[in-house]
Swiss-Prot record:
PROSITE patterns: CHAPERONINS_CPN10. GO terms for cellular component: cytoplasm. One of its GO terms (biological process) is chaperone cofactor-dependent protein refolding. This is Co-chaperonin GroES. Belongs to the GroES chaperonin family. Its main location: cytoplasm. It comes from Streptococcus pneumoniae (strain Taiwan19F-14). Heptamer of 7 subunits arranged in a ring. Interacts with the chaperonin GroEL.
Length: 94
C-alpha cells in the first residue's frame, strides 16, 4: 500500500458519471473535476513554529478533485492518483 508524505493524498478515482448529493454534474463540470475516494493521507504539514496541521480529509471520504491534478500511479493492479491536499476542492457529504 502507498503511504503519502506531507500534505499528499492517495485517491482512487471513480469511473462513473459524477453526482454530488444526487445531482448529476454538468458536462463542463465533469471535464474540470473528478470524483474520488480517499485511500490514504500523509501526516500533514508543519507550520513555521513546528506545529503539525493534520489533513482536512480522511480515509474513506469521497471528494471532488481537479481533473488534471496529481500523478497517476499503480500499486499492483490498482490505479491511483496522488495529489496535494490543495487540489481537493470539496468533501462530498451524502
Amino acid at each position: 500500500m502507498l503511504k503519502p508524505l506531507g500534505d499528499r493524498v492517495v485517491l482512487k478515482v471513480e469511473e462513473k458519471e459524477q453526482t454530488v448529493g444526487g445531482f448529476v454534474l454538468a458536462g463542463s463540470a465533469q471535464e474540470k473535476t473528478k470524483t474520488a475516494q480517499v485511500v490514504a493521507t500523509g501526516q500533514g504539514v508543519r507550520t513555521l513554529n513546528g506545529d503539525l496541521v493534520a489533513p482536512s480529509v480522511k480515509t474513506g471520504d469521497r471528494v471532488l478533485v481537479e481533473a488534471h491534478a496529481g500523478l497517476d500511479v499503480k500499486d499492483g493492479d490498482e490505479k491511483y492518483i496522488i495529489v496535494g491536499e490543495a487540489n481537493i476542492l470539496a468533501i462530498i457529504e451524502e
